[in-house]
Amino acid sequence: GKDKAEAFFLDGMTHAMNNVAEQAHPAFPVTIYYAFKQAETKDHVGTSSTGWETFLEAVLRAGFALTGTWPMRTERDARSIGIGTNALASSIILVCRKRAVNAPTVSRREFIRELNANLPEALLDMTRGGVNSPVAPVDLSQAIIGPGMAIFSQYAAVLEADGQPMSVRTALQLINRFFAEDDFDHDTQFCLHWF
């Protein structure tokens, strides 16, 4: 069923990303376009959805490290949806480079420490322009994934307390936790939920 479909997608996408990684030149970043279906984002906060997690897992398994993400509004809000069609909700560009072959491993605690040290400045960079900010408020939850996953993916593994590698899902949850409601004032919370 669903688990077999996810495994099939992960294997196929990992193979495709391995081919891209083999052809990538270290002097240039690789950009990958990913489009979210509405069904992927319906029941999840931000971008923590199964398809997105599986796609990111394939990119990381291929040996890429993310250096950034850029959300794109490519779909019309008022698009007519036909019966049985998949409507796209939004799109995102991933910017990647090959991960260092001698990349170290870190603990969950060190990963969280790095998130807490780096994400506030990254968020400030995305919002410091006010109305003219480089990232719209509605896209912040997707955009913050770039700096967060850049930290996560630079390592060969982030190890949980039991020594097992942290999953992409857990990493995304920790990154999205930075976006928890209590981190923002009332007006910002309203805007984030409104959009």
Where are these regions (language model features)?
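S-adenosyl-L-methionine-dependent nucleic acid methyltransferase catalytic domains
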Residues: 1-195
